[in-house]
Amino acid sequence: MVLTLLRLHYARGERKALLGNAQLCLKRGGDEREDRETNISCESALILLSLAIDVKNDIVMTAIVGILNKQAVAVAADSAVTVGGGTKIYNTANKIFNLSKGCPVGIAIYGNAALNSCVPWEVVIKMYRKHIGSNKFATLSEYMDDFFNYVRNYTKKYISDEDALNVLKRNLLHFWCVEITQGLRESDDPQSPIAKPALPILLDKLTKLGARLKKEKILSEYKDVTPEDFVKAIEEVLEIIKNQISANGGKWKDEFEAVVEDCLYRLSVTNNPFSRSSVSGVAIFGYGEDEIYPSLHEQQVYNMVLGRLRISPIPDNNTINETNGASICPMAQRDVIETFIEGVSNKIKNTFLDATATAIKKTVNDLSAVTRPHNPALADAIKGMDYSSIIDQYRVQINSIIRRDQVVPLIQTIVSMGKEDIADLAENLIYMTSMKRHVTPYAETVGGPIDVAIISKGDGFIWEKRKHYFSPELNRTFFDTQQ
């Protein structure tokens, strides 16, 4: 009965009711472990939580591009957001904002649309805008530091430890069901036990994953997160995994417990695809008070692990100065824009280079085989040749040609373009990405109206194109208060 009720809440998208009943199941499960039906309800509750689609949290935002020269910085963004892994797409998202009223500084958001998958970034940004008031900073880096200090304090004030921990549990369970045990369970149902013949395969998979993760350094933000504290915090998740493994005779204590705990711990505290799966990208662009040229800086904000928020800078060359007169900075879905910049897609380029390496390897092996009957020593020498340096040299040469013939001429042209021209270029790069998605047999994850903002030293933050969710003619008071 409880399980049916949970599924009904899940199907209707009733998150609040789902959470309430799930937590009740977890409490019952903690008190009555010997009751098999209660354990199933406990298990189902957490799995449903891990797979449930929450339109406020699981929103992924897509294409943004920034173009800079000595006159201005222009940033364009589409309006598409993808919900629940691509099951639903809306074309109404705002991704570009003025960070500080009256100051030439903007901010753009891509990736996860919510801080720690809890609070929409738009809410955080607009609260920061009130917080900063009329304060100004000498450099853009100082604006960025002040904003992220505010974000850290914001998470402590507005995101409870319980909510943050629920997000971590949900993500871990989702990763377990989709990436680890997919194809190893008795059925496609994520609640089903691990099939008995698949238990050795699962153990081998976990052992190899653990070995890879041990090579990764524990990130500095999580140095004080001990394995013991982590395991205690996610004990409900481990109970679910234990039940799945033990149902068909898996030896939890003897074989699986240590390796599962170690894998989940290291997945959460190292830099890997799991920890990057819910990342928000934040780009801050414009001018500090003492700067005459614009810049654009990106940071990645990760979900919290036991109360610790990780914010990581992305190395860039998007600061305009006397030696760097222009820059194009694609963010999120970069493939179409990078093809425009380089004249060839990275996918095609890498495929071509891989095919060349395969052809060289085959030629070496064929030459060795032909030589062997006549001169075995020479054949061995040929087969033992290290031709990786040839491939590396070839790769460097290809990249050099692309830069000389494609990238440099484009950047040199952008150096002398006016504000309106770089704004038009930014808009068209987003439009090209949208059109590419439109004519391919995949979800249209880039689309909708394109917003374009220009920031110059003299004029400050200017909207060239901006959508509204309301009619400006009917809401004059809104614009009056903005003044």
Model-flagged regions — what are they?
Residues 37-40, 46:
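Compositionally biased, low-complexity segments
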Residues 9, 27, 46-57:
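Short, positively charged and aromatic/hydrophobic N-terminal segments
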Residues 56-483:
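N-terminal nucleophile
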Residues 11, 22, 32, 43-45, ...:
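Short hydrophobic alpha-helical segments enriched in small aliphatic residues
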Residues 12-15, 28-37:
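Intrinsically disordered, glycine-rich low-complexity segments
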